């Protein structure tokens, strides 16, 4: 069972147990509180398959965070529009009634102007000190051993991502391997306070058996076994540690946002692991207010596409199963469906496919033909991330609530 099954159970949990709540968008939600999802990265890259996901948008937003960027122009230029509504709402609130010299702009016109007018984009495309600013340039009161001088602003800032990488390389057993986006002193300057507000990484040493397996020597015995072990032990290119990532999220738009968040933090884990030569091990999400917007409920049901047990029963082919069906006790929907699950009878018209893989290209050649390694801090481009063997069901459209 991988994280997609956890996700589908979460949708079902909200539909069955969610309480109605009002929210800042005025849409209304059904909500549960305090859930956790987990995924072992060796089961595949956790990009949902029960609906088609926008891979390029996931990569683009994460690189936007890692650049320390807070202006949507980078996103818009790369056809990623998940923050359009927040920027447009900010524009509407902060412009006068006539929108100054711009006239009345529809959201589509606003986004086109962001794309084509650099001066306009600089003024109205910025979302305030959101994720990227906090990850890469958290303002501190003065100079300390963690801070650097930001020449653009003149402030002393802390580059949390750079510090995290340095700590992973020098003190991987630290319990302070954290990055935080919840800067209380700057929340009122943000167009939208962070929903996923922080993450922590954890590392452990790999066993000799795990390193042998990574090197392709699993199960090797005989005369040369000790020599192979010594070779693997001395080979520093074979990772010596596994790394896991856990993120915390206060507000979870379960239908649209959470699938993005899962894939984004999984990709971040892959990038960091590659940077510090560790093996991505486990991804964990701690989720607070876990909700479905009321205008996403039908879409969630479509994604689940649960098949009633009476239809599932007709898929039985083994004569002994057909005979024993009537002896299920207690004869309740829950027990019947569990019995059918054990016999691998499809429970949904959108059964999950095997998860894909992600390949990261961190090698490059400079203008002088000299090879170099790209860094999580500044080097990656959208084209450096290749999604392999991704098979999915059709997309399910739903409105973005701002």
Question: Across the structure, where does each feature detected by a protein language model lie?
Answer:
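Terminal, non-catalytic protein-protein interaction segments that mediate quaternary/complex assembly
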Residues: 1-402
């Amino acid at each position: 069972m991988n994280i997609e099954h956890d996700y589908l159970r979460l949708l079902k949990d909200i539909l069955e147990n969610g309480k109605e709540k009002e929210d800042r968008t005025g849409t209304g939600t059904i909500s549960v509180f305090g859930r956790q999802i987990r995924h072992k990265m060796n089961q595949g890259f956790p990009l949902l398959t029960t609906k088609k996901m926008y891979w390029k948008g996931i990569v683009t937003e994460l690189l936007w965070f890692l650049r320390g960027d807070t202006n949507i122009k980078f996103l818009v230029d790369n056809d990623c529009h998940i923050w359009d509504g927040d920027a447009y709402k900010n524009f509407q609130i902060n412009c006068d009634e006539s929108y100054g010299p711009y006239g009345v702009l529809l959201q589509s016109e606003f986004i086109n102007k962001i794309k084509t007018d650099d001066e306009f984009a600089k003024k109205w495309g910025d979302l305030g000190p959101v994720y990227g600013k906090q990850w890469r340039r958290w303002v501190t009161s003065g100079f300390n051993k963690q801070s650097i001088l930001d020449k653009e602003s003149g402030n002393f800032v802390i580059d949390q991502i750079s510090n995290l990488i340095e700590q992973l390389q020098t003190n991987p057993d630290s319990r302070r391997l954290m990055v935080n986006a919840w800067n209380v002193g700057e929340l009122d300057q943000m167009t939208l306070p962070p929903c996923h507000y922080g993450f922590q990484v954890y590392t452990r040493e790999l066993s000799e058996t795990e390193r042998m397996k990574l090197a392709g020597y699993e199960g090797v015995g005989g005369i040369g076994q000790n020599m192979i072990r010594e070779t693997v032990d001395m080979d520093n290119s074979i990772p010596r540690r596994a790394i896991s990532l856990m993120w915390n999220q206060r507000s979870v738009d379960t239908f649209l946002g959470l699938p993005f968040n899962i894939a984004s933090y999984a990709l971040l884990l892959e990038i960091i692991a590659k940077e510090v030569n560790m093996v991505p091990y486990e991804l964990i999400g701690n989720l607070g207010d876990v909700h479905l917007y009321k205008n996403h409920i039908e879409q969630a049901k479509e994604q689940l596409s649960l098949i009633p047990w009476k239809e599932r029963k007709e898929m039985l082919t083994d004569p002994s199963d057909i005979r024993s069906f009537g002896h299920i006790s207690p004869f309740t929907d829950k027990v019947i469906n569990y019995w059918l699950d054990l016999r691998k009878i499809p429970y949904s018209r959108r059964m999950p496919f095997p998860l894909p893989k992600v390949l990261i290209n961190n090698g490059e050649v400079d203008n002088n033909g000299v090879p170099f390694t790209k860094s999580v801090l500044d080097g990656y481009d959208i084209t450096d991330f290749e999604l392999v063997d991704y098979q999915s069901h059709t997309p399910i459209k739903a409105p973005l609530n701002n």
